[in-house]
Design a protein with these regions (language model features):
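Two-component/phosphorelay signaling modules centered on CheY-like receiver
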Residues: 4, 12-32
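PAS/LOV and related PAS-like sensory modules
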Residues: 17-18, 131-154, 161-165
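Acidic catalytic/metal-coordinating carboxylates
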Residues: 36-39, 60-66
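Active-site beta3 strand of CheY-like receiver
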Residues: 47-54, 58
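Alpha4 helix (beta4-alpha4-beta5 surface) of REC/receiver domains from two-component response regulators
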Residues: 62-69, 73, 80, 86-104
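C-terminal output helix
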Residues: 89, 107-116
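PAS/PAS-like sensory domain cap-loop motif
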Residues: 163-174
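PAS-family sensory/regulatory domains
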Residues: 173-185
């Protein structure tokens, strides 16, 4: 395992320190501790952690869920939520940020390590998929022939510039339309 950089966002300093010690023993580098959502965003911008362990309830100024949404949108940093709350409303709000994990307090070392390993593996997989998608799109856009891709239902999901010229449709306008509506043989 490489030395992954972790940021802990926890408003209880004793809990934060306990997690920091556990992570150090597991071989992770804790690059920052934050006690509020605003601090989390600021320190993430400064330290660029590989992953963030985020308490959901951080106070009224900015919740952990709001901070996680900002980290995802602006920095693409994955978040694992740490919480003592498992009610439906909290879980529904947390899911909107597409977290990489959800640990219910109190948790043991094995649960923490497993959740981190799975989240970091998923992050690496997501990054690879994104790189492959970008490479494929660049390749298809540079082909001199018209290329139109559809999903399993025959709806347009991609058109290169040559296909746009051939059909008279812009990719953004054709996306989601049935191929028969866009291209007539």
């Amino acid at each position: 395992m490489g030395r992954y950089r972790v940021m802990i966002v926890e408003d209880d300093p004793i809990v934060a320190e306990d997690i920091r010690i556990k992570l150090g023993r597991m071989g992770y580098e804790v690059v920052a501790l934050a006690a509020t959502g605003r601090q989390a965003v600021s320190k993430a911008r400064e330290h660029r952690p590989d992953i963030v362990l985020m308490d959901i309830r951080l106070g009224a100024e900015m919740t952990g869920i709001e901070a996680a949404a900002e980290l995802k949108e602006n920095y693409q940093i994955p978040v694992i939520f740490l919480t003592a709350y498992t009610d439906e409303d909290t879980l529904a709000k947390a899911k909107l940020t597409e977290p990489y994990g959800y640990l219910v307090k109190p948790f043991n070392d094995r649960e923490l390590k497993s959740c981190l390993e799975i989240a970091l593996y998923r992050q690496a997989s997501d990054r690879k998929i994104s790189e492959n998608r970008q490479w494929l799109e660049t390749t298809l856009n540079s082909i001199g022939d018209a290329v139109i891709a559809t999903d399993e239902n025959g709806r347009v999901s991609f058109m290169n510039p040559v296909a746009e010229m051939l059909t008279g449709w812009k990719e953004a306008d054709a996306a989601g339309k049935r191929i028969q509506a866009v291209f007539h043989i």
